[in-house]
Structure formats: C-alpha cells, structure tokens
A protein has these predicted regions:
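Transmembrane alpha-helical segments that form the membrane-embedded catalytic/substrate-channel core
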Residues: 37-49, 83-95, 111, 132-149, ...
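Solvent-exposed interhelical
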Residues: 35, 39-66, 71-72, 137-180
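The first (N-terminal) embedded transmembrane alpha-helix
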Residues: 2-19, 106-109
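Extended hydrophobic alpha-helices typical of membrane-associated regions
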Residues: 53-60, 168, 186-215
Length: 215
C-alpha cells in the first residue's frame, strides 16, 4: 500500500524529541532539529525503499542534508557515515537477520535519541538512559512487526512474530519494555504516594488533670 507518510514522520520525530528531552537532552534548537530531520530521513527512506510512500527522493535527501549539516556544524562529522549507512544497510540486514531486526532498530534509535543530541548540545551521555531508549525502541519495533507479518512472510522475511507467533512477540516486547523502565531508573512503588497513619501517643505518666484529681 502506497501512502503519504509526512504526518507520520512528524509524529515519530515529535515522539523522539519528547523521549530525548526525558533522557536529559537540553531544550535547544539544534538537537531537536537534528532529531526531527533524522526521523524524516530514516522513516521516509525506509518506506521509499519498500515502495510504500509517495515521498520524493528530493524531500528525503533534504532531511538527510539537514541532519548532516547539523552534525558538521557541531563538530560531530564522524556520525555522518553511520547516519547514512544505517538506512542503506537496513533492507539487507532485515532480510538476512530478521530475528535481530528490532535490536538493529533499537540500537540506532537509541543513538539518535540519547547519544548524538547530547553530543550536539555538549551534554554528557548517560549510559543507562541510552540502554533504556534502546530497549524501548526495540520493544516498539517488535510490536510494529506484528502488522507486517503477512507481507514479511510473502517476501521471505521471518521476523519474530512471523516465526514464533503474536503472543510470544508481545511477551518479548513486554519484557523489553520492563527492562527499559528498570534501566531508566523509574521505580513504580516509590513513585506512588504513600499513606501515613496517625497513631495515638501513649504517655507513661497520667495527664495533669488526672494528677490533680483527689483519690
């Protein structure tokens, strides 16, 4: 099915930007613009290579150029090659190693959310946050493969849901999500409000009123 995915790409970029802010990326123009451009390039190029989008090569290339110019301007040019190759190598990787496809996606999305934006903003990269984002992206990618099971089987691509079924896929995604929550440092029991009970105080000596009462 061929569709126009500009709105979807904007939604993906927005979600990635929010996740980046949650992982400590400063609220600055360049890191967020890089994330939006990378999402536009990665998602658009993937759909274009699969023949599932009406995007023009020029619009996709413009997004890639924007992301690369930001990397060059902030002295992060060493990430330009991975920015390009991660998408160009993705179709062959998905075909040859389909069971590892969610983790491939998770690795590069973690870099685009929690590593490169931090470097652009000259902020320390937090290891646990990067791992958490990688696990979260892997979980989402794994769930997204459920909708493409029929097409993947027709194309000879046996992803996790195509090989093991829907329920095991959901169980794996749930485990990846819980791992993401754990690595992010969120502790649900401590996040919930606790109840404090007022207990009566007992005195070892009688109150003054009773001390004065004649016995």
């Amino acid at each position: 099915m061929v569709t126009s995915n500009t709105n979807t790409q904007m939604e993906v970029g927005t979600i990635m930007s929010v996740l980046a802010l949650c992982s400590g990326t400063p609220l600055e123009p360049l890191p967020l613009l890089y994330i939006m451009a990378s999402a536009r390039w990665a998602y658009g190029a993937d759909r274009y290579l699969d023949g599932k989008t009406e995007d023009t090569p020029e619009s996709i290339a413009a997004a890639l150029l924007t992301a690369n110019l930001i990397l060059w301007y902030t002295d992060q040019s060493k990430y330009i090659a991975p920015e390009i190759l991660c998408i160009l190598l993705y179709p062959s990787f998905k075909r040859n190693l389909p069971l590892l496809k969610p983790f491939y996606v998770g690795t590069f999305w973690a870099g685009a959310i929690s590593v490169v934006p931090h470097l652009i903003a000259h902020t320390d990269v937090i290891e646990n946050e990067t791992i958490a984002m990688g696990l979260l992206a892997s979980s989402v990618s794994n769930i997204a493969d459920i909708e493409d099971v029929e097409d993947d089987i027709k194309n000879g691509i046996y992803t996790i849901p195509a090989r093991f079924g829907i329920n095991p896929t959901r169980a794996l995604s749930a485990g990846l999500f819980l791992g993401s929550v754990y690595k992010s440092g969120v502790r649900l029991p401590h996040a919930l409000p606790s109840r404090h009970m007022c207990r009566p105080r007992f005195f070892s000596s009688p109150l003054s009123f009773f001390r004065k009462f004649p016995l």
